Amino acid sequence: MGTPPRTFLILGCFLTGPLLTLCQLPLPTIVPNRNEMVVQLNSNFTLKCSGDSEVSWQYPVTEGSHRIDIRHEENNSGLFVTVLEVGNASAAHTGMYVCYYNHTQVEDGEVEGKDIYIYVPDPDMPFVPSLPEDQFILVEEGDPTVIPCRTSDPSAEVTLVNSLDKPVYAFYDSKQGFVGNFLAGPYTCKTMVKGVEFKSDEFLIYILRATSQLPVEIEALKTVYKTGETIVVTCVVFDNEVVNLQWNYPGKVKEKGLIKLDDIKVPSQKLVYMLTIPDVLVKDTGDYECTARHATKEVKENKKVVITVHDKGFIHLEPQFSPLEAVNLHEVKNFVVDVQAYPAPKMYWLKDNVTLIENLTEIVTSSNRVQETRFQSVLKLIRAKEEDSGTILWLLKNEDEIKRYTFSLLIQVPALILDLMDDHQGSAGRQTVRCLAEGTPLPDVEWLVCKDIKKCSNDTSWTLLTNNISDIHMEAHLDERNMVESQVTFQKVEETLAVRCVARNDLGAVTRELKLVAPTLRSELTVAAAVLVLLVIVIISLIVLVIIWKQKPRYEIRWRVIESISPDGHEYIYVDPMQLPYDSRWEFPRDGLVLGRILGSGAFGKVVEGTAYGLSRSQPVMKVAVKMLKPTARSSEKQALMSELKIMTHLGPHLNIVNLLGACTKSGPIYIITEYCFYGDLVNYLHKNRDNFLSRHPEKPKKDLDIFGMNPADESTRSYVILSFENTGEYMDMKQADTTQYVPMLERKEGSKYSDIQRSVYDRPASYKKKSLSESEVKNLLSDDGSEGLSLLDLLSFTYQVARGMEFLASKNCVHRDLAARNVLLAQGKIVKICDFGLARDIMHDSNYVSKGSTFLPVKWMAPESIFDNLYTTLSDVWSYGILLWEIFSLGGILYPGMMVDSTFYNKIKSGYRMAKPDHATNEVYEIMVKCWNNEPEKRPSFYHLSEIVESLLPGEYKKSYEKIHLDFLKSDHPAVTRMRGDCDNAYIGVTYKNEDKIKDRESGFDEQRLSADSGYITPLPDIDPVSEDELGKRNRHSSQTSEESAIETGSSSSTFIKREDETIEDIDMMDDIGIDSSDLVEDSFL
């Protein structure tokens, strides 16, 4: 049997294949004969390949593509057969399977043969796993590339996204992936399987730029080393990573050195190669070179660095100055030293063995590296001083060597004359002039004289002195301070001459001059100098006295009238009291006024007890209080007192204020005549009745009296002004002044102008005609009998009356500014009256007042806005009202016990500190205090609401009793009331009403006034029309007969005369002598 012809053909091709390219075998065949096939997941499949020569398989190699078995089979037909079997197929087996002849050449990883593409769809792995090297894609710039994100399912829809998760549009082939031109960067493929999104591995495309050169840099941390250290050299290749790098260095032959690819930074396209040589020797000195070659192009680049290795460290100095340096005073000078050293040395500057610290204010040292082994150190003198002279040492040291450099610093100082003085020696005319000079170098001293004083301004008039002159002697020497002391002695000075001392050194010359006076002229100059000194002392003393006088506090009225300038009333201005009118109806004749004891005296004036004759028909004789200034008062204080008078005339009458009765403003000092209050100020009254109060209220134990700051038995230590009847202080001179027309006072019995008023009927409380109330306490609230003592209802009554009085002031737009218990007086019947007693109080020595500039302020009573912002309103008076309540219910205790008025006090007030509840206050009363002390003024209650609140705490009958007394007061012929009506009869100012309707109008006007108390505008009471002349005549005819009866019916200000126990017959006789019927003598019960 012969060989088949096909066998010979194949054998012939093998023999001639290398020589004959036209002899080619047919492609192998694959069974199944398909281009692609889909295989179910986890199934088995078999591929059989046959060909005319030995064949092999090329199949996908990915992670998980194992379980592939290849075997060869015999075939009778002479074909070569190879079988590929895959068991448990997975998505990793998806790919191209190629059968090829063994002799086929492989080009770029691909072979020529028969192929079939197998899909193994896996819903849990839609993308075929890829090898790590397939995820980094290198591509030449401008060439297309393939992103091999293949799917295991041919029907899958795939999207390509970039690093920003934005889609990239390109052609997609499930067998290859995305094909196109892409920018450098990372890419990811996405697909959806049954509503679930899957992502492929990230593929990084790196573009190789077409370049004709390789940017290469070589870097060395150091170029100088010493033996035993480690050399580190780095070679950096930019812009292209496909390079081959080669090192050349002295130790390369012995393979000494470690080469490492440090890192790859794709964004900057940089490759870093590091050469490390440990334990270097001197012979490692030389060139270190790196050469980079492009992997695909004929591009080459090399760089080198010279490395020097020393046996040990070294220091070489190069100072830029000499061992002796001279610097002028105040000059700025730099001393520079250049250094070559390795390792880097530590450098120190020392002066006189003391280390100089860097960055001093006047000597600055600095050191810096110029190059790798070159350094520079600088010592800088800033405005050189004399004490900078000395020895300067510059010290350098490193691990292997120490070097020093020393130089001397000399500060050159210009010549300076420290002193030039003359020494008088006896009366014969011998005088010595001494000149003390210094400088560096030491100066030379010369002496010159000028005998013609008028021409001494010309240098040619000066003559140089020498020792050749017979009556002149000169000498010089160094003193213990190394200063030049030169002196010249003149044996006789017969006339005035000028002497000049000249000190000169290398930096210049200075001169000083003095005049030598003949002994005969010296005594005259001494007298003139003494007179001049005395004149200067007198002028300075006058200036000091004027300053002290101007800084002395001036009297100013605390009450102020305000006028709103904004709709909400929050903005206001003070009304100038001097612009208010003064009605002459208030004028009272001086001869109708007799002055008595001083009730109170202050820095600016005093309040005197007095007796007024003829203020009203029902009260021909009335005890009054007279306010006046001291004789030393200044014009500004007189103007302030006149302002107070005008404000009081503007306010009008009210039961709970100290009412104006009259005034004396003409032909003499200003007198303000006001009501007299029997019990004095409220503080004094509370102190005196404290024990009585505690005995009536045993539930209030007598605790330690720290809150009062005193011993109860020692009332002399109180800081309040007590309105006692002490005969202290001087009376104001009532005699006629030299420069003014003065109306003398009407002389009474025995011609006395000043009457020492005894305790008589005017001291006795009057009685009121009022209904009996159901409760005994209410009966005594407005009682005239002082023996009833002090009760808690009395304290509430005082509180209520003050609120009503302040409500009245607020309705008149009047701000008190000093509301305190010391400025609240108590009249008969326990009627409270608000006043301003500042004139009669020595506020400069009163601990309740704190100095603020040229004035004194009651800080503990003031609202925060008044203390810190100088803002005074009715609402700031509300704060003071709360403080007053604390005084009342502590029975006159000291405010803020234990606290001084200092920065701590102010900070506590700002932070919300408030006083605790006083011992005798109820919770309701303390709640009123807290409301008054609200830090926000607009949240404080008005006086109208305060009176309503306090009224609710009093018995129901109290308001009726109070309103009756108040109404009776407004109906009475009290001088404060009658002078506000019209001037109906010049001879008699009495009760002149048309009818009772006007009285009702006044009542209703008062109610309206209360409702408008916080309106911010002045709301005067309605005027009362006078009665007709006929009706007036009828009333006047009966007035003398019914004065007592009418006084009792009014129940307000008059009561019949009743002799008191301490009253004498002489008092009655005195009134009879002046023509006053004692039966007609009445007294205002509110005084």
Swiss-Prot record:
Its EC number is 2.7.10.1. It is a single-pass type I membrane protein. Ubiquitinated, leading to its internalization and degradation. Residues 1-23 form the signal peptide. The active site is at D818 (proton acceptor). Residues 550-1087 are cytoplasmic. It is an enzyme of class 2 (transferase). The keyword Cytoplasm does not apply. Residues 1000-1011 have a biased composition (Basic and acidic residues). Present in an inactive conformation in the absence of bound ligand. Binding of PDGFA and/or PDGFB leads to dimerization and activation by autophosphorylation on tyrosine residues. SUPFAM superfamilies: Immunoglobulin, Protein kinase-like (PK-like). Residues 593-954 form the Protein kinase domain. Belongs to the protein kinase superfamily. Tyr protein kinase family. CSF-1/PDGF receptor subfamily. This is Platelet-derived growth factor receptor alpha. It comes from Gallus gallus.
